[in-house]
Swiss-Prot record:
Protein name, entry field: Fructose-bisphosphate aldolase
EC number: 4.1.2.13
Pfam families in the cross-refs: F_bP_aldolase
Protein's job: Catalyzes the aldol condensation of dihydroxyacetone phosphate (DHAP or glycerone-phosphate) with glyceraldehyde 3-phosphate (G3P) to form fructose 1,6-bisphosphate (FBP) in gluconeogenesis and the reverse reaction in glycolysis.
Classification via CDD domains: TBP_aldolase_IIB
MF term (GO), any: fructose-bisphosphate aldolase activity
InterPro entries: Aldolase_TIM, Class_II_FBP_aldolase, FBA_II, Fruc_bis_ald_class-2
Positions annotated to bind Zn(2+) 2: D102, E132
Length: 305
């Protein structure tokens, strides 16, 4: 069933579990995510980026919305990292039930203004909104920000931001980063900062860049001929602790891509004469489903539908 993001996430934060937001780019990813959700009886969020929407066009967005409507568990269709008001309006027209406006690279006042504009438009049609807030290193309005605080969310600013914008859930910058880590040192979550934010912001909180990047997946990808540098993700125990502190939505993309691509490579490597797409996309779809199921177990969303 198709529901708003807030319907899923408000319950998750109140009851202390997390819900996965899994990025999809095609039919196989969408099917894998929804099949996993139904098998695990878990709510889920299908996330589409602007890049995915450009790649698949209206055929993709209509398919994702239609499959979400048919699902036997609560599903939100979410715009991931919407860069503009126009991008959000496009998602609203396509039937999305959750949208993100990401103006975190702008100054605080611009972020507030642009986010509030999106909130007003989305709420007018019953759609809920995710916003993002971070800090840049340097000095702004006589406030010095140390390098260790660069890009990290300021708890008091988060409270003010949510009060002024009316956003429904907030993506916080607490140390994670998008994609697989390559030469950036061990990824981390600033749990004390998260705890301070959660005390001031009662809304559901969102963790981006939360893929685990399991070494077995990395090695399987390499063994099948893939090339990837040193890569690591967020430790499962760090994710669990973050959920206990108020994180309700956890984004995952890299792990799904690794699993899917590794299986396609493996299948074609073992069967070089194969040219039936179903024979290599099918196993890849199953690999994605298994990753999604394991993430749902980690997040504690199993049986919560």
């Amino acid at each position: 069933m198709l529901v708003t993001g807030l319907e899923i996430l408000r319950k998750a934060r109140a009851e202390g579990y997390g819900v996965g937001a899994f990025n999809t780019n095609n039919m196989e990813f969408t099917q894998a995510i929804l099949e996993a959700a139904e098998e695990m009886k878990s709510p889920v969020i299908l996330a589409l980026s602007e890049g995915a929407m450009k790649y698949g066009g209206r055929a993709l967005t209509r398919m994702v919305v239609a499959l979400a409507q048919e699902a036997r568990v609560p599903v939100a269709v979410h715009l991931d990292h919407g860069s503009s008001y126009e991008s959000v309006l496009k998602a609203l027209r396509e039937g999305f039930t959750s949208v993100m406006i990401d103006k975190s690279h702008e100054d605080f006042e611009t972020n507030v203004r642009e986010t509030k504009r999106v909130v007003e438009a989305a709420h007018a049609v019953g759609v809920t909104v995710e916003a993002e807030l971070g800090r840049l290193a340097g000095i702004e309005e006589h406030v010095a920000v140390d390098e260790k605080d660069a890009l990290l969310t300021n708890p008091e600013e988060a409270r003010i931001f949510m009060e002024r914008t009316g956003a429904d859930y907030l993506a916080v910058a607490i140390g994670t980063s998008h994609g697989a880590y390559k030469g950036k040192g061990r990824p981390f979550i600033d749990h004390p900062r998260l705890a301070r934010i959660a005390k001031l912001v009662p809304a559901p909180l969102v963790l981006h860049g939360a893929s685990a990047v399991p070494q077995e997946l990395v090695e399987r990808f390499r063994a099948a001929g893939g090339e990837i540098g040193e890569a690591s993700g967020i430790h499962p125990e760090d994710i669990k602790k973050a959920i206990s502190l108020g994180i309700a939505k956890i984004n995952t993309d890299t792990d799904l891509r690794l699993a899917f691509t590794a299986l396609v490579r493996e299948t074609l490597g073992k069967n070089p004469k194969e040219f039936d797409p179903r024979k290599y996309l099918g196993p890849a779809r199953e690999a994605v489903k298994e990753v999604v199921k394991s993430r749902m177990e980690l997040f504690g969303s199993v049986g919560r539908a």
